[in-house]
A protein has these predicted regions:
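Short, ordered loop/turn segments at secondary-structure junctions
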Residues: 68-70, 136-137, 179, 200, ...
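Acidic, Mg2+-coordinating active-site environments of NTP-dependent enzymes
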Residues: 5, 9, 66, 70-74, ...
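N-terminal leader/targeting and accessory segments in enzymes
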Residues: 1-88, 257-260, 265, 283, ...
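Phosphate-binding loop of NTP-binding sites
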Residues: 7, 86-228, 232, 236-244, ...
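ATP-dependent carboxylate-amine ligase
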Residues: 1-14, 35-38, 84, 124, ...
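A short, gly/pro- and small-residue-rich
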Residues: 49-65, 76-85, 193-199, 216-218, ...
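Short, active-site-adjacent cap segments at secondary-structure transitions
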Residues: 71-72, 111, 138-141, 181-183, ...
Length: 482
């Protein structure tokens, strides 16, 4: 592709390169740079790509797009925002694949993964369409699974995925869109037919610093979509919509929303309610338990309506949809009189949600096994402890992904959450041993909730990911005869 074609739509401040030059690839990581590439130097959250311009040139980069010009002469192109430019370059390189599909984005603290999976099922079964998915658990093209390690990939990889989806015949792309992705322009230039807002609770304050900043990052989506389907019960929604340019449709249980849930029934086997609009009332049943599932279901129904799918057609699909991996997932414990659940709950509110759900049906104790991630928002650690203290009958405090922090230091930050509580707890630093300890000390009818890892099958320690699948840990301990 000619350099000028690649730079189309990017404001260029200066250029010391022939725009007719043929570019054979694009890289933003100097370690992956190939001869003939355009290297894009970005200022990142953890490092600055400008430090690696010399390395990229040594590896054969034909040109460099940057914000800050290096000293001396070179094949440099300067722009005001190279991160945003990478998103435009990705769309140009892959031929604007998002324009070939109907795009749907889901943002919010909790519920994004469940929402995307439910909506994907409705589009596939009610519309007979092939659907692409980008999410925390995995990326999918139809039924083909593509592993992932972040909620929203870098912008160039997002465009690569869109191209693969479009080429495979996907009519829709449904994606989890994190606040990081919106703030860091990973989806810059993508216009969504529908944007969904689930909720906003404390998370990622290591990055955003304040809840106001966190909300404002989410709000970017609603200046780049046609219809916004938003939680009318969430107190952050008015701020979220302050500068919105989309048509807004609300859903809720408490508010006078466009789409409401009435006659809600919660059970161990799932949820049921009437979905009510100004013109109809349709009974809904989903075989996933938890009060929070009412909201996850409402936002999906609202999005489907915005896409022209009736409540009745959506209801027929939702009644048959299976569990989502790592979300209130039951782990087999044959021959035992206790239950083990795995859930991705890794924020104070999501822990409260899942433990409340378990309390609704548990005949015995609710036992929470949890930790907090290292190198992340420290202020939520005591709140995680308080969530466990308030909503479990016993807690096992352990590690999550400690990353570069000492696990014992993270645990010390969690424990003040138990200060005003009589809830007993045990500290078992090693997560594998913590799970085994909980199983060994389980009582009849206990429900042990392994919080935090969910779909993840690894533990991150000192920049390395080690295999750790909680399903395997449970099975191996059971097989050991313990």
């Amino acid at each position: 592709m000619k350099l000028w074609e690649l730079l189309n739509g990017i404001p260029v401040a200066s250029c010391a390169v022939d725009l007719e030059m043929e570019i054979t690839g694009v890289s933003y990581d100097s370690r992956a740079t190939q001869p003939g590439d355009l290297f894009v130097a970005m200022t990142g959250y953890a490092t600055d790509g400008h430090k690696y311009i010399a390395t990229a040139l040594e590896k054969g980069a034909a040109a460099v797009l940057c914000q800050n010009l290096p000293e001396g002469e070179g094949p440099y192109i300067r722009t005001a925002d190279s991160r945003r430019a990478l998103a435009v370059i990705g769309a140009n390189w892959f031929g604007h694949p998002a324009e070939e599909m109907t795009m749907i984005a889901v943002t919010g603290t909790c519920g994004k993964t469940t929402t995307t999976y439910l909506l994907k099922a409705i589009l596939e079964q009610a519309r007979g369409a092939k659907v692409g998915l980008i999410g925390t658990n995995q990326n999918m093209i139809g039924q083909e699974v593509i592993p992932t390690d972040r909620t929203t990939p870098e912008s160039f990889e997002v465009q690569r995925l869109f191209r693969e989806m479009a080429d495979a015949g996907c009519a829709y792309a449904v994606m989890e869109t994190s606040s990081h992705a919106l703030c860091l322009d990973r989806v810059y230039g993508v216009y969504y037919a529908v944007g969904i807002f689930t909720n906003l609770t404390q998370d990622h304050l290591d990055f955003h610093v304040t809840m106001e900043n966190y909300c404002d990052a989410k709000a970017i989506l609603f200046r780049n979509c046609g219809v916004g389907v938003v939680n009318g019960d969430d107190p952050w929604t008015p701020r979220l919509l302050k500068d919105a340019t989309c048509q807004v449709r609300t859903y809720g249980v408490k508010s006078e929303a466009d789409l409401r849930a009435e006659n809600v029934v919660l059970s161990a086997n799932g949820i049921a309610f009437d979905a009510v609009t100004k013109t109809e009332r349709v009974p809904i049943r989903v075989n996933i338990p938890g009060g929070f599932m009412v909201y996850n279901t409402l936002d999906v129904l609202g999005a489907a309506l915005a896409l022209g799918i009736s409540l009745k057609d959506s209801a027929a699909v939702l009644a048959k949809v299976p569990h989502v991996q790592g979300r209130v997932e039951v782990v087999p414990t044959p021959g035992k009189d206790y239950t083990i659940l795995i859930d991705y709950a890794h924020t104070p509110d999501s822990m409260v949600n899942v433990l409340q759900t378990v309390k609704e049906f548990a005949k015995g104790r609710t036992v929470a096994v949890f930790g907090c991630g290292g190198d992340r928002d420290k202020t939520k650690r005591p709140r995680m402890g308080k969530a466990a203290a308030d909503w479990s009958d016993f807690a096992v405090v352990t590690t999550d992904n400690p990353r570069t922090e000492e696990p014992a230091a993270i645990i010390r930050d969690i424990l003040p959450g138990f200060d005003d509580s009589n809830t007993p707890y045990e500290v078992v630093e090693d997560r594998v041993e913590a799970i085994r300890w909980a199983m060994d000390h389980a009582q009849k009818d206990d429900v042990i909730v392994l919080c935090g890892k969910g779909h993840e099958t690894y533990q991150e320690v000192n920049h390395q990911k080690f295999h750790m699948d909680e399903r395997e840990i449970v099975a191996e301990h059971l097989n050991s005869g313990r």
